[in-house]
A protein has these predicted regions:
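C-terminal catalytic lobe of pepsin-like aspartyl proteases
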Residues: 1-147
Length: 147
């Protein structure tokens, strides 16, 4: 049933091979699995770990502009996106997210959570056309994860 969800004990979390929530040293947390959507909500620590992992991976690439916002009141890490970049152009840079439930590692490819957006921030219906030589793209690629 696509409207069902389950609460499970989240024991660990990794982005690629980087341990963000260590099951050996940290207490488990409640995790919810929703089989009806692609929305993933993770603890703030895990969200920040993924975003910092992405930032570390692309920081030396001058063709990629990865931007994260901060929440005005709490200064917590907010939405992150690739500016002036199509999702198809960055999916090869993404590592998978790995969740540990019941001592089993489950892997999700993060490109399932990348959404192309237009310059006004609206999700586009289909992937943008390839960018030709000398052309620029004024949209972006949003990471659809939430803390």
């Amino acid at each position: 049933n696509p409207t069902m969800y389950w609460g499970v004990e989240g024991q660990g979390f990794l982005y690629g091979d980087k341990i963000i929530m260590d099951p050996e040293h940290e207490s488990p947390t409640l995790a919810v699995i929703d089989s009806g959507t692609t929305l993933v909500m993770v603890p703030s620590k895990c969200y920040e770990g993924v975003m910092m992992g992405i930032a570390d991976k692309v920081k030396d690439d001058p063709s990629v502009s990865f931007v994260c916002t901060r929440e005005e009141d709490s200064k917590a890490l907010g939405a992150c996106y690739f500016n002036n970049t199509r999702c198809l152009d960055v999916t090869h840079l993404m590592d998978p997210m790995k969740f540990i439930f019941g001592n089993v590692v489950y892997e999700l490819k993060i490109d399932a959570f990348l959404k192309d957006v237009s310059a006004n921030g609206k999700v586009v219906d289909s992937p943008p056309s390839p960018i030709g030589p000398g052309e620029t793209y004024d949209g972006g690629c949003m990471v659809e994860l939430r803390p």
